[in-house]
Design a protein with these regions (language model features):
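N-terminal glycine-rich, Lys/His-bearing helix-loop that initiates the first secondary-structure elements
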Residues: 1-70
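Short hydrophobic transmembrane-like helices used for membrane targeting/insertion
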Residues: 43, 58-61, 175, 179, ...
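Short glycine-rich or small-residue beta-strand-to-loop segments that form or flank ligand, phosphate
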Residues: 110-112, 236-239, 444-448
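Long, intrinsically disordered low-complexity tandem-repeat segments
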Residues: 180-208
């Protein structure tokens, strides 16, 4: 057989070229391709005279990748003598997990090297038996549906409602001055012709394609209907926060589920940072039985790293059993080190997360006056449940999830209806700002503690 003498490194070459473009990631992973520490051990999460984390500055990345492979190989281990086994930890991995358990206040916390997908698979197998009934939020991760198929479960779905967003005419033109409103030259005029400027800066609501929270009342009605039909669910599984950052009232949902003897699984993959932020409670604190968090999404951790938290001791044995089934038998020490470092960073640097919250608040306030694009802000331009509105569909929201919504009816300079996908293309092609996801009417930018003041300023000005 004729064999080629040389093999081209397509992946490595493509990534090198991508890095050289100098794009800025408004997407996961949460480390934003930047190291947490300098060579002297000091933190580099600050704006400095050399640009620090400036979106267009790739010098730090270029320097760090020179020794990338040497560093990776030097820290890649296996279950050898004097080392530990993630599946049966007895030494320093056990110590690390014990420390994480204290940080999160759980009965047990486990590292996931196969991502939150393996955690969701494990959680469902730990709470359900073959042929059982499960009540799932319709916007759950695809791993939930795969687990349903594997166990031949009978699913029942609870569907969140779409959220309305209020619009007004603002003064600032950043991020929207290249667009006009299809309803007329004056985009402060609603479809009914009512001027929404003037006293009180009146606003008009518009339906978005963003799903709201899981209504506790709707959940309880669904459970009662299922029980009346002889189909009591073994578990309820919901996503909170959602991809768009919408948070459900986990405390009430947990109380309802437990009242009927049903386990509650919360996919908190998008909210791994909430444990370290002020003003938020995690699903663990609010009564969920099993919670899965993706460290790599919003924390400075490598892609594919996640945590599974167990709150109900009765589930721990089955969880450990299925973790060994759904995870590789050769777990990466590099992944484990990354997870430990991310959790330690969060626990030991609370002030950094306070500063992160302050940056988000300043950025959000700047965005309040945008015209044809608005930042999704429950409590500001979207009603929250605590405002006494029976039609409200958002209990809370992660301010770190930047969702920019295009006003319905907005057109570009050529008269074409403007979409989220078009906004994503403009940000990427003209300014090198890469968003996480583009929908019909909005884009999602994932922020993290790593994003600098300069990063937010550049995003706003574009």
């Amino acid at each position: 057989m004729l064999r080629r003498k040389t093999v081209k490194e397509y992946i490595n070459e493509a990534l090198e070229k991508y890095i050289e473009k100098g794009t800025y990631p408004w997407h996961m992973p949460g480390h934003k391709r930047r190291p947490l520490e300098k060579s002297d051990g000091s933190m580099c999460l600050k704006d400095d005279e050399n640009g620090g984390q400036s979106p267009q500055n790739v010098d730090n990345i270029s320097k760090s990748r020179e020794n990338f492979w040497n560093g990776v190989y030097a820290h890649d281990f296996t279950e050898a003598k004097d080392l530990d086994d993630m599946h049966e930890p007895e030494m320093f991995i056990a110590d690390s997990l014990a420390e994480m358990k204290k940080v999160y206040g759980t009965f047990a916390t486990y590292m996931l090297v196969n991502g939150s997908t393996s955690g969701l698979m494990t959680a469902i197998h730990a709470t359900c038996h073959r042929g059982d009934v499960i009540l799932a939020a319709r916007n759950c991760h695809k791993a939930v549906y795969n687990a349903i198929c594997m166990l031949e479960l009978e699913p029942e779905y609870i569907v969140p409602d779409y959220v309305d967003m209020r619009w007004h005419c603002g003064a600032n033109q950043s991020m929207s001055d290249r667009m006009t409103d299809a309803r007329g030259k004056d985009d402060c005029e609603t479809q009914e012709g009512t001027d929404i400027r003037g006293e009180g800066d009146r606003e008009t609501p518009e339906r978005t394609d963003i799903l709201g929270d899981i209504s506790p009342d709707k959940l309880e009605r669904a459970i009662n209907t299922m029980i009346a039909d002889g189909r009591k669910p073994s578990a309820v599984i919901i996503t909170s926060p959602t991809y768009e950052g919408v948070i459900s009232d986990i405390r009430i949902i947990a109380e309802i589920a437990h009242r009927y003897g049903i386990y509650l699984i919360v996919d908190e993959a998008q909210g791994a940072h909430l444990n370290f932020m002020e003003g938020y409670e995690t699903a663990m604190e609010q009564g969920a039985d099993i919670v899965i968090e993706s460290l790599h999404k919003t924390m400075p951790a490598l892609t594919q790293t996640s945590l599974l938290h167990v709150m109900d001791p009765k589930l721990d044995e089955r969880v450990r059993r299925y973790l060994q089934i759904f995870q590789t038998s050769s777990p990466s020490y590099i992944f484990m080190q990354s997870m430990e470092k991310a959790v330690a960073f969060g626990a030991n640097n609370r002030a950094v997360f306070v500063e992160y919250g302050r940056r988000l608040e300043i950025f959000a306030e700047k965005c309040d006056n945008l015209r044809n694009i608005r930042l999704f802000r429950p409590g500001v331009n979207v009603s929250k449940n605590d405002e006494g509105c029976s039609a409200c569909k958002v209990f809370d929201h992660d301010e770190g999830r930047l969702v920019f919504v295009v006003r319905p009816g907005t057109v570009d300079g050529s008269g074409q209806i403007f979409t989220g996908a078009m906004l994503a293309d403009i940000l990427a092609d003209r300014y090198g700002l890469i968003v996480e996801m583009a929908s019909v009417s909005y884009v999602i930018c994932i922020s993290s503690v790593v994003d600098s003041v300069d990063s937010y300023d550049i995003l706003f000005k574009r």
